[in-house]
From Swiss-Prot:
HAMAP family: UPF0223. This is UPF0223 protein SSP1692. It holds the Pfam family UPF0223. It comes from Staphylococcus saprophyticus subsp. saprophyticus (strain ATCC 15305 / DSM 20229 / NCIMB 8711 / NCTC 7292 / S-41). Gene3D superfamilies: BH2638-like (1.10.220.80). Belongs to the UPF0223 family.
Amino acid sequence: MEYQYPIDLDWSNDEMMQVVSFFNAVESYYESSVEGEKLLDRYKQFKKIVPGKAEEKQIFKEFENSSGYSSYHAVKAVQSSPDQKLFSAKSK
């Protein structure tokens, strides 16, 4: 799938890589499966870079508009079932 990740040019290279890593975990949730702990760890790193709720919503919306994948729903699915190890949108 061809699309661009929502990246802020003010972020450092390391921050950009961490944000992309989070979105890669979201992609795994929709395309195959992802470990819940891995997705939440990457989300925590994302939140260190994007602490504001409004900015998070904007970035999530940009990503969903370009990819079709809802970061919000992926994170909520994992948070709502803390005992489950693997998560996938395909197994719903």
